[in-house]
Curated annotation (Swiss-Prot):
Binding residues annotated for DNA, in chain numbering: R292, R311, R316
Catalytic activity: ATP + H2O = ADP + phosphate + H(+)
Lineage, highest ranks first: Bacteria, Pseudomonadati, Pseudomonadota, Alphaproteobacteria, Rhodobacterales
Protein name (database record): Holliday junction branch migration complex subunit RuvB
GO cellular component: cytoplasm; Holliday junction resolvase complex
Gene3D superfamilies, A to Z: 1.10.8.60, P-loop containing nucleotide triphosphate hydrolases, Winged helix-like DNA-binding domain superfamily/Winged helix DNA-binding domain
Organism this protein belongs to: Ruegeria sp. (strain TM1040)
Keyword set, alphabetical order: ATP-binding, Cytoplasm, DNA damage, DNA recombination, DNA repair, DNA-binding, Hydrolase, Nucleotide-binding
Region: Head domain (RuvB-H), residue numbers: 256-339
The encoding gene: ruvB
Binding site for ATP: L21, R22, G63, K66, T67, T68, E129, D130, F131, R172, Y182, R219
Binding-site residues, Mg(2+): T67
Biological process, per Gene Ontology: DNA recombination; DNA repair
Function: The RuvA-RuvB-RuvC complex processes Holliday junction (HJ) DNA during genetic recombination and DNA repair, while the RuvA-RuvB complex plays an important role in the rescue of blocked DNA replication forks via replication fork reversal (RFR). RuvA specifically binds to HJ cruciform DNA, conferring on it an open structure. The RuvB hexamer acts as an ATP-dependent pump, pulling dsDNA into and through the RuvAB complex. RuvB forms 2 homohexamers on either side of HJ DNA bound by 1 or 2 RuvA tetramers; 4 subunits per hexamer contact DNA at a time.
E.C. number(s) listed in UniProt: 3.6.4.-
Length: 339
């Protein structure tokens, strides 16, 4: 099994629910400039017209702020916020219970909307389009359809797997918004602000050191910051410097690129056992005793984004940057390839 460090994975952990660190409005939200600018227009238009905002879909890698933005949309509209997730809505009745309790213009947020039960999804279509709910009462010959009028509402969906959404559902979102990985400068701002809120101010070099290793993801930056704060309080004077951040993150196994032990084992396997590749994903899966899905969804996205590996029709290959990072000279054939 790959021993992936949960601190460096963008999936939510209980410690991420620190409301004090979450931005409360669009003005406080750092990053995603294009998405924020567009949302500001859509929100203001809905407020001036006194109507529900059009249905909105946030998509992109985990940990970039989809849930936070959904909460901000409701707060800026001045309406109630209801939250659920695709796997929780097992039956049409589960969705009906939520929809019938919404007030006018409320925001309903469905996380992991790509995991909706198809039967539930069918019920959602008329609710999104016409604000009506068609429910089947009874069974067999005695079954009948009852139509329930709903208050106009805004559905905000979030997904990390846009390709798994059915076309009919995807087409019903009037405002599709892709969230991008954050730049180091944006993460630097986030880390600096949150360090002050945690009572352990960071100097510029210290905040930037954490930002550089946060894998372009605010959720990961927040986790790394908390761990560095622990070191600053116990082994320092409560201030985060570059030296303290570097020492703490190195002890936590987070290297200069933000890679953990699982990432480095993946790269070393391709380098040392397969000469840099190409090597098939099934072979990688067997060699690392890990499922193909785990490799493709947990390990590889960041390695691809950083230009450390390449996916080719023949399999995975290391890029020149990976050889440099590992401190290993590429084989002669690959050296010629890279020039």
């Amino acid at each position: 099994m790959i021993d992936a460090d949960p601190t460096l994975r963008p999936e939510p952990l209980p410690e991420d629910n620190d409301r004090a660190l979450r931005p409360q409005g669009l003005g406080e939200f750092i990053g995603q400039a294009e998405a924020r600018a567009n949302l500001r227009v859509f929100i203001e238009s809905a407020r001036r017209r006194g109507e529900a905002m059009d249905h909105t879909l946030f998509h992109g890698p985990p940990g970039l702020g989809k849930t936070t933005l959904a909460q901000i949309v409701a707060r800026e509209l001045g309406v109630n916020f209801r939250m659920t997730s695709g796997p929780v809505l097992a039956k049409a009745g589960d969705l009906a219970a939520i929809l019938t309790n919404l007030e006018a213009r409320d925001v309903l947020f469905i996380d992991e909307i790509h995991r909706l039960n198809p039967a539930v999804e069918e019920v959602l279509y008329p609710a999104m389009e016409d604000f009506e709910l068609d429910l089947v009462i009874g069974e067999g010959p005695a079954a009948r359809t009852v139509r329930i009028e709903l208050q106009p509402f805004t559905l905000v969906g979030a997904t990390t797997r846009m390709g798994l959404l059915t076309t009919p559902l995807r087409d019903r979102f009037g405002i599709p918004t892709r969230l991008q990985f954050y730049t180091i400068d944006e993460l630097f701002e986030i880390v600096s602000r949150n360090a002050r809120k945690l009572g352990a101010p960071a100097d510029d070099a210290g905040a930037r050191e954490i930002a550089r290793r946060a894998r372009g993801t605010p959720r990961i930056a927040g986790r790394l910051l908390r761990r560095v704060v622990d070191f600053a309080v116990v082994e320092g004077d409560g201030t985060i410097t570059r030296e303290l951040a570097d020492g703490a993150l190195t002890r936590l196994g987070v290297d200069q690129l933000g890679l953990d032990g699982a990432d480095r084992r993946y790269l070393r396997l391709v380098a040392e056992n397969y000469g840099g590749g190409p090597v098939g994903i099934e072979t990688m899966s067997a060699a690392l005793s890990e499922s193909r899905d785990a490799l493709e969804e947990v390990i590889e996205p960041y390695l691809l984004q950083q230009g450390l590996i390449q996916r080719t029709p023949r399999g995975r290959m290391l890029a020149q940057k990976a050889w440099t990072h590992l401190g290993i000279a590429p084989p002669k054939s690959q050296s010629d390839l890279f020039g």
